[in-house]
Curated annotation (Swiss-Prot):
<dbReference type="GO" id="GO:0006351">
    <property type="term" value="P:DNA-templated transcription"/>
</dbReference>
<protein>
    <recommendedName>
        <fullName>DNA-binding protein</fullName>
    </recommendedName>
</protein>
<feature type="binding site">
    <location>
        <position position="325"/>
    </location>
    <ligand>
        <name>Zn(2+) 2</name>
    </ligand>
</feature>
<keyword id="KW-0479">Metal-binding</keyword>
<keyword id="KW-1194">Viral DNA replication</keyword>
<feature type="modified residue" description="Phosphotyrosine; by host">
    <location>
        <position position="129"/>
    </location>
</feature>
<comment type="similarity">
    <text>Belongs to the adenoviridae E2A DNA-binding protein family.</text>
</comment>
<dbReference type="InterPro" id="IPR037540">
    <property type="entry name" value="ADV_DNB2"/>
</dbReference>
<keyword id="KW-0862">Zinc</keyword>
<dbReference type="InterPro" id="IPR036367">
    <property type="entry name" value="Ad_DBP_C_sf"/>
</dbReference>
<comment type="subunit">
    <text>Homomultimerizes on viral ssDNA bound to pTP. Forms a initiation complex with viral polymerase, pTP and hosts NFIA and POU2F1/OCT1. Interacts with host SRCAP.</text>
</comment>
<feature type="region of interest" description="C-terminal arm, DBP binding">
    <location>
        <begin position="440"/>
        <end position="454"/>
    </location>
</feature>
<comment type="function">
    <text>Plays a role in the elongation phase of viral strand displacement replication by unwinding the template in an ATP-independent fashion, employing its capacity to form multimers. Also enhances the rate of initiation. Released from template upon second strand synthesis. Assembles in complex with viral pTP, viral pol, host NFIA and host POU2F1/OCT1 on viral origin of replication. Covers the whole ssDNA genome during synthesis. The complementary strand synthesis induces its relese from DNA template. May inhibit cellular transcription mediated by the interaction between host SRCAP and CBP.</text>
</comment>
<dbReference type="GO" id="GO:0006260">
    <property type="term" value="P:DNA replication"/>
</dbReference>
<keyword id="KW-0597">Phosphoprotein</keyword>
<dbReference type="Pfam" id="PF02236">
    <property type="entry name" value="Viral_DNA_bi"/>
</dbReference>
<keyword id="KW-1048">Host nucleus</keyword>
Length: 454
C-alpha cells in the first residue's frame, strides 16, 4: 500500500501577494560619552606624572607626587578612581639606635607641599581662561610656557584690550608675559628660592647723564667706521636716521656699500683696543653706535616710569630689563658671543611732527621730550640680508615701555584669577663673570648610557 503526500495549495496564492512585514530598524547605537578632561585630584596626578617624566627625560633624579596635608599620597588607578594612601612612618636612626630628624626628609616634604601649592596657583590662572594644561609641568620648558602664553592671549582677547607695540613683536610680548606668570607661581608658593623663571632683573643703570656698561664702569667714546651692504636693514636705517654721517662708496672689491663714520660711538672699557664690531673675552658686550641717542633713550624710560608711578623712589635710577632671551632662558649653558640681551636705542623720528602743546599726558610727553627708546633684542641677533652666524639666535625683541606694559598685564591677570597681589620680586643685577662675552665654546658631549661608542 503506497503512501502519497498531499500538499494543499491555496487558490489565492497565485493571484494575490502575501503581505510582507516591514523590516525592523536596526537598534540605535548609543552615543559615546565625550571623554572628560581630568579635574581635581585626577588633573593634579596627571600633571605630576608628566613632570616626573620630564625630570626623567632630562636625567634629573627624583619624582613628583601629589600629597595631602595629612601626608596621604594621592594616586589614580586604571579606572580613574582616586586612591588615598597613608604615608608610612619611617624612623631614621643613627648607629646608637636613637631616632634622628632627617633634615632632607623635611625639606622634601616641604617641597611637595609647595609644589602642590604652586600647582593650585597655576590651575587657577589657566582654568580661568579654559587653557589646556596637559603639558604643564611647572618646569621652565616649552610646554609650561605655552600654557601661560595662551592664558595671556586669552586675557587680552576676552578683555578686549588693545595693546600697542613699539619696536616689539607680539611673539616676544607673549613670551615674556608667560615667563612673568610662571615667576609669580614659583614665588607665591616659595617653591624654588633663588630661581628666577622670569629671566628679568632690575638694573641700577646710572645713565642719567653719562653711559655706564654692565660692569658698572663708564663707557669709552670711540670712533667707529662701519661698512654695510646697501640692501641690509642696518644700512637702510643708517641712511634714513643719519644721512649726514653716511655715504655710499665702493669698497676694495668694487661693491657698493654704505660707509658709516660715527664719532659718537661708545664701547665697554674692556673693548678699547678691539677693532670695530669685535669684543674681548672680558667684555660685557655693550656697544652704542650713537651715545647721545642712548642717553636720550635712558631719559625716556626714566621720565616714563616717573609719569606712571610718581611715588616710585627709584624710577630714575633703576629699570626692569630682560637679561635672557629665548636662546638661554631655560638653559644654564653659555652661548657663543653675548650672554645678555643686546640693548639698542631706537629713535622715534615720527614724534617730531607732534605738537607738544596739544599733549598734556605726562607719559606721552616722556617720549615727545625724549624721542628715543631702549629696545632689548636677542643676545646675538642676526639681521636680514646678513651672512649666517655661528651663534644661536632668535627673534626676541621688546622695548622698555612695552616691558612695563607686559608686567602690568601679568599683574592684572594674577589679581583677577588668584585674587591677591602678585609677588613681584626681581633680583637686582650685579656683574658676574658668567655674563662675560664668550669668544670660544669648548666642545661638549651628549648623554649616552652605552659603555663604548662603537
Amino acid at each position: 500500500m503506497s503512501h502519497k503526500k498531499v500538499v494543499a495549495i491555496s487558490e489565492s496564492s497565485s493571484d494575490e501577494e502575501v503581505p510582507v512585514a516591514p523590516p525592523t530598524a536596526p537598534p540605535k547605537k548609543r552615543q559615546r560619552k565625550a571623554v572628560e578632561e581630568p579635574r581635581g585630584h585626577q588633573a593634579m596626578v596627571e600633571i605630576a606624572r608628566q613632570a616626573t617624566a620630564a625630570l626623567k627625560a632630562r636625567g634629573d633624579p627624583g619624582s613628583i607626587i601629589v600629597q595631602t596635608f595629612c601626608d596621604q599620597t594621592v594616586d589614580v588607578d586604571k579606572e580613574g578612581n582616586v586612591i588615598f594612601t597613608p604615608a608610612k612612618q619611617k624612623s631614621i636612626c643613627n648607629k646608637s639606635g636613637s631616632p634622628l630628624a632627617s633634615v632632607a626628609s623635611k625639606i622634601f616634604k616641604a617641597s611637595e607641599h609647595k609644589w602642590q601649592s604652586a600647582m593650585e596657583f597655576a590651575l587657577k590662572v589657566l582654568n580661568a581662561y579654559q587653557v589646556d594644561h596637559s603639558k604643564l609641568t611647572l618646569l621652565p620648558d616649552e610646554g609650561t610656557l605655552e600654557c601661560f602664553k595662551k592664558a595671556v592671549q586669552a586675557y587680552i582677547t576676552t578683555s578686549k584690550m588693545h595693546v600697542t607695540y613699539t619696536f616689539t613683536n607680539q611673539k616676544t610680548f607673549l613670551h615674556v608675559a608667560g615667563r612673568l606668570l610662571l615667576d609669580f607661581v614659583i614665588k607665591a608658593a616659595e617653591l624654588a628660592p633663588g630661581v628666577n623663571p622670569s629671566g628679568c632683573v632690575v638694573w641700577q643703570h646710572g645713565c642719567q647723564s653719562s653711559l655706564m656698561c654692565l660692569h658698572g664702569s663708564p663707557m669709552i667714546q670711540k670712533e667707529q667706521l662701519v661698512e654695510m651692504d646697501v640692501n641690509s636693514e642696518n644700512a637702510q636705517r643708517a641712511l634714513k636716521e643719519n644721512p649726514e654721517k653716511t655715504k655710499i662708496v665702493s669698497n676694495r672689491w668694487g661693491r657698493n656699500v654704505v660707509q658709516f663714520k660715527n664719532e659718537d660711538a661708545f664701547c665697554c672699557s674692556m673693548d678699547v683696543n678691539m677693532s670695530g664690531g669685535n669684543f674681548s673675552g672680558a667684555s660685557c658686550g655693550m656697544f652704542y653706535t650713537d651715545g647721545p641717542k642712548a642717553i636720550m633713550a635712558f631719559q625716556q624710560i626714566m621720565a616714563f616710569l616717573k609719569a606712571c608711578y610718581p611715588s616710585m623712589p627709584n624710577a630714575e635710577s633703576h629699570l626692569l630689563m630682560p637679561l635672557k632671551c629665548e636662546c638661554n632662558w631655560n638653559s644654564s649653558l653659555p652661548l657663543l658671543g653675548r650672554q645678555t640681551c643686546k640693548i639698542t636705542p631706537f629713535s622715534l623720528a615720527s614724534a617730531n611732527h607732534i605738537d607738544k602743546s596739544e599733549v598734556d599726558d605726562q607719559k606721552m610727553l616722556a617720549t615727545l621730550n625724549n624721542p628715543a627708546m631702549l629696545v632689548f633684542q636677542c643676545c646675538n641677533p642676526v639681521y636680514r640680508n646678513s651672512k649666517a652666524a655661528p651663534q644661536k639666535n632668535c627673534d626676541f625683541k621688546i622695548s622698555s615701555v612695552d616691558l612695563v606694559s607686559c608686567l602690568q598685564i601679568a599683574k592684572q591677570i594674577w589679581l583677577s584669577t588668584v585674587g591677591e597681589k602678585p609677588p613681584v620680586k626681581f633680583p637686582e643685577f650685579h656683574w658676574s663673570d658668567e655674563h662675560r662675552y664668550q669668544t670660544t665654546i669648548l666642545p661638549q658631549g651628549q648623554h649616552d648610557d652605552d659603555l663604548v661608542l662603537f
